[in-house]
């Protein structure tokens, strides 16, 4: 078995030209990939995305674990994107960062790609403990301004800091922390917490299975969110078009601006929306079970016999707010 010293790569000072396939020891360093649309694949480890200083994508690789020597790195154009792929040995992967009693399973192609929806590849299981290949890869990715990146990570954590470009993140069991992004952002996450701050772009799309979502200072033309379970908090939101669909968990939304359309469908959990005092919208609330409380002047107010629905006009009625809540209180308050 290699010593721990040989398993941890030494980051080279010079930037290396990346061949198609390298052993992990030789691949240690920072690499440049030319293009405008990139895809990065990594099964286990941390991925940090930062602002790049040039015209090319840069990727720094640090291999971890007793079996890190079995990792390989591959590049090249696949499906119209310039790719950087960490290829793991066959068999189960042990990644302690997942947690001792946790595991995730997916299908991985021989070229190291996964989660592209066609369901092909070998079965790979990643566990937090037990027997298997003990290896992971930590990546630091520098994204040039104005470029697009599709990031795939099965287990670990993703952080994004002060990036100017379009970003799509697809993670299995991995936390996501974004602080500073100017561009479109798409997230597809299985389970793990999501934190977003200082986002400004055309579209923001979030699809999560389970885990909390906390966002602050978010500005986008259109925002869509689909959450299976977990509390959702969106604070300081500027958008004219919002669509939120949550299965279970409390929803808190603080709007900075007027809206054209807000649609919110909540299975269970309380819904609290803070709006500007001059917001104008036609309001339609179906509360299911739970109280409905609107603490703003409401014109043309009407409700059914059981008081589990409410309709009316806020302000000039320019926009539209539609809320469908299965169970839990619904409150609309002045910000």
PLM region spans:
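Intrinsically disordered, low-complexity terminal regions
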Residues: 1-335
């Amino acid at each position: 078995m290699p010593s721990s010293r040989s398993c941890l790569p030494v980051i080279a000072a010079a930037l290396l030209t990346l061949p198609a396939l390298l052993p992990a020891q030789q691949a240690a360093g920072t690499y440049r990939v030319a293009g405008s649309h990139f895809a990065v694949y990594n099964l286990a480890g941390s991925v940090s995305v930062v602002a790049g200083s040039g015209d090319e994508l840069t990727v720094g690789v640090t291999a971890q674990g007793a079996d890190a020597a079995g990792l390989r790195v591959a590049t090249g154009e696949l499906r119209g994107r310039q790719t950087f792929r960490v290829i793991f040995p066959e068999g189960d992967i042990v990644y302690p960062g997942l947690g001792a009693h946790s595991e995730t399973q997916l299908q991985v192609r021989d070229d190291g790609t996964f989660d592209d929806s066609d369901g092909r590849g070998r079965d790979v299981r990643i566990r937090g403990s037990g027997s298997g290949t003990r290896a992971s890869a930590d990546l630091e990715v520098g994204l040039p301004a104005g470029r697009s990146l599709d990031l795939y990570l099965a287990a670990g954590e993703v952080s994004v800091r002060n990036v100017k470009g379009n970003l799509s993140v697809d993670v299995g069991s991995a936390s996501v922390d974004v602080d500073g992004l100017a561009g479109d952002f798409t997230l597809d996450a299985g389970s793990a917490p999501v934190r977003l701050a200082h986002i400004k772009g055309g579209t923001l799309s979030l699809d999560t299975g389970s885990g909390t979502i906390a966002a602050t200072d978010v500005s986008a033309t259109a925002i869509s969110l689909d959450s299976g379970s977990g509390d959702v908090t969106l604070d300081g939101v500027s958008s004219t078009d919002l669509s939120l669909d949550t299965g279970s968990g409390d929803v808190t939304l603080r709007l900075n601006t007027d809206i054209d359309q807000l649609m919110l469908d909540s299975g269970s959990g309380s819904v609290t929306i803070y709006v500007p005092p001059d917001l104008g919208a036609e309001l339609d609330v179906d509360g299911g079970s739970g109280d409905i409380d609107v603490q703003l002047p409401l014109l043309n107010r009407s409700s059914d016999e059981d008081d589990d629905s409410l309709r009316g006009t806020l302000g000039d009625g320019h926009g539209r707010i539609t809320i469908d809540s299965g169970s839990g209180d619904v409150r609309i308050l002045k910000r």
